[in-house]
Amino acid sequence: YREEGYDFLALTDHWFMGEERQEENFLLLSGAEYDVGNNVRDGIYHVVGIGMQKEPKLEKGPELQEKQAQLMIDRIHEAGGIAILAHPAWSMNRASEVRLLKDLDGCEIYNTTSGVPWNCRPYSGIILDELAAQGYVLPCMAADDAHQYTGDETKSYLMVQADELSRDAILEAIAQGRFYASQGPRFWIEKKDNSLIVHSTPVKEIVFFTDAVWSDDRATVGECVEEAVYEIQPHETFVRVELKDAVGNRAWSNFYLTGKAVL
């Protein structure tokens, strides 16, 4: 990962917390992935903890089965970390169930190893949009979740606007929403009057997602797109952006909230 230009990383093995380590120009954050559930009818939840300062008080057993994902979220926070819902599409989580969870710090909109050829359902944007339309807005994250290391590594990541390369600065930036998820495209968003303007490295698509089912100017497509403009409609409560470059790499913004009430 360092050779591919990464500045920080978290090793999140199942039920094993990797320790934090600071090296020259590279930060390894503590991390682990916790899971509960055996079938989609009762619910399968995987929650990733990042930046914990001690081992979360979690173990498999009756208490976890009863309280499920909420207990994992709470214990990660008690240990000083942030809690991220992993691959909800892969887990077949329903928006109606996810919205009952309290204090999530983010949700994976894309999970590399959940995609072909290793698996299926890597993309969770529809679930995140359904939640946002109901007023439950989660930051959009991307991760490799690399299991095979046959191409599922160094693909999906966060671009974080942090003041320095340290645990506190990275976690603070994530908590404040100063990041976006990407597989390569870089971009920034400008608000001007009632419009959002996206500036990016060259891509083929810039698409605006909202809680409106129809808009005739939400997609800008071409061979070398570097800017797109979207005029926010009066009834829309959120806007988010997705980009795709010439080789299929994508990027995802967080949600921009318009201030309109969710009815």
PLM region spans:
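A metal-dependent hydrolase metal-coordination microenvironment
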Residues: Y1-A86, M92-D103, E108-L128, A143, ...
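Short amphipathic alpha-helices and their capping/turn segments at secondary-structure boundaries
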Residues: D129-A133
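C-terminal functional module detector
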Residues: Q134-P139, D144-L263
